[in-house]
């Protein structure tokens, strides 16, 4: 079942999304990934119109979660100063992929290369400079690859990232405006 109904509603109310500030506060739609494979997807959206109803939105989202089954929960839904912060928690990235009808990869750089990902993918170092996926210094590092235009918060420091991303904090990357995936981030 397409998730476009709920996501369409959430994104339809977006008037303005601001850039990420400190790594502690999420200010844009962000997928937070953890080393154990779990993930939290945070949606940030304008919710200031008087006809917006948080309870209706939560009810609609809960129906989508129940239709999906186990592996996904609504962890929070709140409005503060006209801004909606809505979070889904996923037991695994495979649940995230199926629920959101997208694809992603989490593993080591070496495993990604063994699975056919391109060795010549250009990456930007968090410390400056450039390298490719075949660089031996990152082969055993964690890698996350995704296709959606959504910021990602890693559970470790960013080492390098694809050229269609920008570093927005020690653990955060964000797609550049107008960019398309796939997006790559290598982290400790």
Whereabouts are the PLM-identified features?
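Positively charged n-region of N-terminal signal peptides that target proteins for export
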Residues: 1-11
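Generic hydrophobic, helix-prone segments enriched in Leu/Val/Ile
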Residues: 1-3, 58, 158-159, 185
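Mature, soluble, non-transmembrane domains
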Residues: 80-188
